[in-house]
């Protein structure tokens, strides 16, 4: 399970990176194997298992992190802070900050929680966010600049809510046309 989560995060981190000149940002230190080893050796089994769990936003609160060392939060379709479908960006950002604070307050490894949001065609869980066509329609435009601009707009709106990980835009090529999430893919052309 842990390997699958790492693989998913790895693939998501490369979303939309092909043929794009990303500015180099030095905000994160290069991985230090000794540091990673030290952190892992200091973690309990409960903390290690917790890092593989991604709880749905509807079923977890910042106070739950005092007891459960959860590694991540997902807000998929129709989830929002405290069930408020019209929550402001400030409410989203406040909740993200609360989760961060509680995840680093527990003691032990103090690994900040990851929050991933489903923003396949915009940050649609946020009231007033810009909604874009699904990827299958965007792929049909064959307009790389448009796709980059949409990706930038979605990233800006997601960051405005204090969330740093989005499950979009995806770079997928349809292999099996029977797959039910075909609309989230671009094109095979």
Place the predicted regions along the sequence by residue.
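N-terminal beta-rich core of secreted/periplasmic extracellular enzymes
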Residues: 18-184, 188
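Sec-dependent N-terminal signal peptides
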Residues: 4-13
């Amino acid at each position: 399970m842990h390997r699958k989560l790492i693989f998913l995060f790895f693939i998501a981190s490369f979303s939309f990176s092909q043929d794009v000149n990303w500015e180099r940002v030095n905000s994160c230190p290069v991985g230090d194997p000794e540091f990673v080893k030290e952190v892992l050796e200091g973690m309990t089994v409960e903390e290690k298992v917790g890092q593989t769990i991604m709880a749905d936003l509807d079923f977890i609160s910042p106070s739950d992190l005092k007891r459960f060392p959860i590694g991540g939060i997902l807000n998929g379709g129709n989830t929002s802070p405290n069930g408020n479908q019209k929550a402001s960006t400030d409410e989203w950002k406040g909740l993200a900050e609360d989760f961060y604070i509680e995840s680093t307050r527990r003691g032990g490894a103090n690994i900040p929680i990851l929050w991933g949001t489903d923003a396949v065609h915009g940050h649609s869980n946020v009231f007033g966010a810009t909604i874009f066509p699904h990827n299958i329609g965007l792929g049909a435009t064959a307009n790389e600049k448009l796709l980059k601009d949409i990706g930038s707009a979605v990233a800006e709106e997601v960051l405005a809510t204090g969330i740093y990980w989005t499950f979009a835009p995806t770079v997928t090529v349809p292999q099996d046309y029977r797959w039910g999430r075909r609309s989230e893919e671009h094109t095979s052309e």
